[in-house]
Design a protein with these regions (language model features):
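Helix-turn-helix
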Residues: 13, 17, 21-55, 59
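Amphipathic alpha-helical linker/stalk segments
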Residues: 58-88, 126, 133-137
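Phosphate/oxyanion-binding loops and surfaces in catalytic or ligand/nucleic-acid-binding neighborhoods
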Residues: 67, 96, 100, 114, ...
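Hydrophobic alpha-helical connector segments
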Residues: 73-102, 139-151
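C-terminal peripheral helix-coil segments that are non-catalytic and often amphipathic
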Residues: 127-139, 143, 157-197
């Protein structure tokens, strides 16, 4: 293995470890020492490759967001029927919630700090989506409301349970396995709420 390959592999290991600590285990305050120990590398390598723990966190967050944005764009650009697009979007969002259970909690915490506001959707996509929603309402497939209310409903149904995961788990006295099962079951529930039969 070349030096460059070893360097690249070490960076990937550190990033994957950080992603696991931050977004799977919910340890947003994990230190460089904890990340290094978990990754099996020297702590100085984190500073060498990423300059700081906060920079590493931003990098892994941006990568997770980029992957999700790319998935959404593929769905939006497809020629699928509107309900099929929404179904794929819901499946992708729920899959991400299961893969990174604390990602939504992190996003909400960053929004509250004022440090996480990036335009997630281009104006052209937004206009097309609102137009498609209006068309579905006119066809009677969705209850009539302002199209943006449909988006609010969908996003709320998808994100809220994951964003308050620790609170739900504590108050409902359920473990990670049961919570993940409930999240996995949400696709049909959400579709039945959003669309008329």
């Amino acid at each position: 293995m070349s030096k460059q390959d070893k360097k690249d592999q070490t960076q990937v290991i550190i990033k994957e470890t950080a992603k696991n600590l931050f977004f799977v285990q919910g340890k947003f305050d994990a230190t460089t020492r904890e990340i290094a120990d978990e990754a099996g590398v020297n702590r100085t390598l984190i500073n060498y490759y990423f300059r700081s723990r906060d920079n590493l966190m931003q990098i892994v967050f941006d990568e997770a967001q980029r992957v999700e944005r790319e998935k959404s764009e593929i769905i939006q650009d497809s020629n699928l029927a509107f309900k099929d697009k929404i179904t794929l979007f819901i499946e992708g969002s729920l899959s991400t919630s299961l893969q990174y259970p604390y990602l939504e909690t992190y996003i909400v915490s960053q929004i509250n700090k004022g440090t996480c506001h990036k335009k997630d959707i281009e104006e052209a996509y937004k206009e097309k989506m609102l137009k498609d929603i209006q068309t579905e309402m006119d066809l009677g497939n969705i209850e009539k409301m302002e199209p943006i209310q449909f988006i609010f409903n969908m996003v709320s149904l998808l994100i809220f349970p994951s964003a308050v995961r620790p609170l739900f788990m504590e108050n409902m006295m359920i473990d990670d396995k049961e919570f993940d099962r409930l999240i996995a079951d949400r696709k049909d529930i959400i579709l039945n709420i959003l669309f008329k039969k």
